[in-house]
Regions:
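C-terminal segment of classical bacterial N-terminal signal peptides
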Residues: 14-22
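Short, well-structured alpha-helical segments that form the helix of a local strand-helix-strand
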Residues: 154-163, 297-301
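Accessory, solvent-exposed terminal regions and/or long lumenal/extracellular loops of proteins
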Residues: 262-317, 321-326, 415, 421-432
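A contiguous strand-loop segment
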Residues: 23-137, 157-288
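Histidine-centered catalytic/metal-binding microenvironments
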Residues: 413-492
Length: 492
């Protein structure tokens, strides 16, 4: 199981004198009134390893003759319904430890991103231990997203699974549809809490529980029946500000690994708040100083605190955990667009590998296929793979960000700006097709558009990598006289 592998590496790294920035995800959510375009956003960087291929694929709708029993690598087993809906997913290429369908849309326009790992505290684990063969990140999307029609249904399905099978890990996840977004924390073996995302707020989510006062009587809350009773009975119940605090009760004490991402992300979007690095209890929900744009979230997922004294690009800050980590295997931003037909759902902006020198490309939720480079399953480097190509560009770019990476990042930013500017016209076209010709015509358009845009970006990335390798080879052992310029011939 991946969590066991990560825990072992963290222990080794800590014993060696510090935890690296190698291991876990960072999430982000925002309500529709917090964003500039009125879209709800759920987003995450999937972080584990700098050499871990991911596949972007579409699972077709399936109707089986009888229910099937699903069993994963750690022994979690569950009977699944006969009918599974079509869904998109970004899964592991090598699946000996699990599928890890990390994010996607289903045919009902429901989007799910799972998970951000988090650890229960010692008292919580003693009172309600994690279940070795319970629900884990490896399988959660696979056994939930194809079987739900709303975000609330998704939360309720997870709650039922944790009630009956238990959880193998502490996890944080997000589910959204055209009406609402939900934020959920699986806090221990059988305890959990989920809340609707406030429409006027955002949250930056490191590997740390953050839920505060959970009003279990609210219709906007779904929680385990013993969420409060258990810690009261076992003596680890905690309050903050005179009310029950879920994260303080169930979680670990926050450390630098998580603190720096909360501090960095909240100050980037809410600089007027002047959030202190020494904050002992961080607020989950914040209000941004200005409406949050798609570009803001892209930059957040690339953020290495460059404008602070904790700039992770400096040698003296090598142990600081940035949000934009080199170990991101993919980074995604989902915009839930209420004007789109429900079956279209919204748009996922996907950057393969780490986002710093990669490019975000848009995909509608109703696509039926992806470009072949997204489906290359090689565990070892393969230049035909979208993941491996973008990872290669990132590796070389990070060797000298000023001379190699700066102009690549600028090139992709301009490329993304053009796509963003064109997106409203594409939204209008898919709505027109859906209304005039129906669901299949809209899906055909979405699939063709997604593949064409990805093909163009992949071709440009191939050229950039070839030029960059040539530039680096020519300048090996000496400082280049000027910075690398990608696709210079294109601009002549």
């Amino acid at each position: 199981m991946r969590k066991i592998y990560l825990t072992t590496l963290l222990v080794i790294a800590a014993a060696a004198g510090g935890v690296t920035d190698a291991f876990c995800c960072t999430g982000f959510v925002a309500g529709k009134d917090a964003t500039a375009d009125g879209c709800r956003i759920i987003a995450r960087t999937e972080d584990l390893s700098g050499a871990h291929n991911k596949i972007f694929k579409v699972y077709p709708r399936r109707k089986r003759k009888k229910p099937v029993v699903f069993t994963d690598a750690i022994g979690f087993s569950i009977e699944l319904p006969r009918l599974s809906y079509q869904y998109t997913a970004i899964c592991d290429a090598e699946q000996s430890e699990g599928i890890y369908d990390e994010v996607g849309f289903n045919e009902y326009g429901v989007a799910m991103s799972a998970t951000v790992s988090a650890s229960p505290g010692k008292a919580a684990q003693e009172a309600d231990p994690l279940v070795p063969n319970g629900l884990s990140e490896a399988s959660i999307t696979t056994v939930v997203l194809p079987y739900i029609t709303t975000a609330r249904e998704g939360i309720e399905r997870i709650a039922h699974i944790v009630d009956t099978h238990g959880a193998a890990e502490g996890n944080i996840l997000f589910i959204a549809d055209h009406k609402e977004s939900w934020y959920m924390e699986i806090l221990s073996g059988h305890q959990y809490a989920a809340v609707k995302v406030p429409e006027d707020s955002y949250a930056v989510v490191p590997n740390h529980f953050l839920l505060d006062n959970v009003d279990i009587s609210s219709k906007d809350v779904i929680a385990s029946k013993d969420l409060i009773n258990l810690p009261k009975a076992k003596g680890f119940y905690k309050e903050f500000g005179g009310a029950f605090h879920a994260a303080l009760t169930y979680g670990e004490e926050i450390g630098d690994y998580d603190c720096v991402r909360l501090w960095g992300g909240q100050n980037k979007l809410s600089p007027s708040e002047k959030v202190s690095y020494d904050t002992k209890v961080f607020s989950l929900w914040r209000k941004a100083d200005k409406k949050i744009t798609l570009e803001d979230v892209m930059e957040l997922q690339r953020y290495r605190y460059e404008d602070t004294d904790k700039n992770a690009n400096l040698a003296e800050n090598a142990c600081i955990r940035p949000i934009g980590a080199p170990t991101s295997m993919e980074c995604h931003i989902i915009q839930m667009k209420p004007e789109l037909p429900q079956s279209v759902g919204g748009v996922m902006w996907l950057a393969m590998a780490n986002a710093e020198h990669s490019v975000y490309l848009p995909f509608y939720g109703n696509i039926t296929d992806t470009l072949q480079p997204y489906k290359v399953e090689d565990v070892l480097y393969n230049p035909a793979s979208f993941y491996w190509l973008m990872r290669s560009i990132n590796i070389i770019s990070a060797l000298n960000r000023d001379m190699y990476g700066k102009n690549i990042r600028a090139y992709w930013k301009n490329y993304e700006q053009k796509l963003i500017q064109e997106q409203n016209a594409k939204d209008a076209e898919i709505i027109r097709l859906y209304e005039k010709k129906g669901k299949k015509a809209a899906a055909k358009y979405a699939t063709k558009l997604g593949c064409e845009q990805a093909a163009d970006a992949f071709e440009k990335a191939q050229t950039i990598y070839a030029e960059l390798m040539n530039f680096a080879a020519q300048n090996e052992g000496r400082m280049p006289r000027k910075a690398f310029e990608p696709l210079a011939a294109e601009r002549k």
